[in-house]
């Protein structure tokens, strides 16, 4: 039993250190951005496939209906980090109906990717702070799943390096996180 707890904590610590290193590189501009054209639909499908076991464990229903390729212009590796952080965040906070819906909308040469999860909305006073390093809305609940308040600050650093929009919107039945990418 103790060995499992130690291994679990070591894994959490390892992930946190890796995330901190990545965030540090992003914040200090030491991480090169490699812009390329890639299919965002395929990237999201791949992230969802890699999180299949976690999705099953959380008993979440993930809805992603896009099948046709949608090409965007960005750093594919970094966009994968953004998608992974948003989906992990949704999985950690999904509640009530346990539905996560991912959508891609296209307008004026921009693709907007949204990740919505049912559950409790983020208190309005906390919304501006969720992008800050180590900020946690619910300290007690975050401990349950091992959140460390770094994921959304990584999203912020990546999207700032792209010069593109991102954000979070409360709905009565959950929260929607979004980001935008150029299609040309």
Question: Which residues does each PLM region occupy?
Answer:
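Short helix-loop "hinge" at the ATP-lid/N-box region of the Bergerat-fold HATPase_c
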Residues: 90-91
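Short alpha-helical Gxxx[C/S/T] motif in the catalytic ATP-binding
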Residues: 146, 151, 155
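Conserved catalytic submotifs in the C-terminal HATPase_c
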Residues: 34-38, 56, 61-71
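Short alpha-helical segment of the dimerization/phosphotransfer core of two-component systems
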Residues: 8-13
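Short beta-strand/loop element within the Bergerat-fold HATPase_c
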Residues: 97-109
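Short conserved segment of the HATPase_c
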Residues: 122-136
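Conserved glycine-rich
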Residues: 163-165
């Amino acid at each position: 039993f103790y060995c499992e707890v130690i291994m679990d904590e070591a894994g959490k610590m390892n992930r946190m250190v890796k995330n901190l290193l990545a965030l540090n590189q992003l914040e200090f501009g030491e991480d090169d951005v490699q812009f390329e054209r890639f299919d965002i639909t395929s990237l999201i499908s791949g992230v969802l496939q890699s999180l299949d076991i976690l999705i099953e464990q959380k008993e979440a229903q993930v809805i992603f209906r896009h099948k046709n390729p949608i090409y965007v212009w960005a750093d594919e590796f970094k966009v994968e980090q953004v998608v992974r952080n948003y989906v992990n965040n949704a999985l950690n906070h999904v509640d009530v109906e346990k539905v996560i819906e991912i959508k891609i909308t296209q307008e004026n040469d921009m693709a907007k990717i949204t990740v919505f999860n049912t559950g409790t909305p983020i208190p309005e006073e906390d919304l501006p702070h969720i992008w800050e390093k180590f900020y946690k809305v619910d300290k007690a609940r975050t401990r349950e799943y091992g959140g460390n308040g770094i994921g959304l600050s990584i999203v912020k650093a990546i999207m700032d390096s792209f010069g593109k929009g991102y954000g979070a919107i409360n709905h009565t039945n959950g929260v929607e996180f979004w980001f935008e990418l150029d299609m040309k």
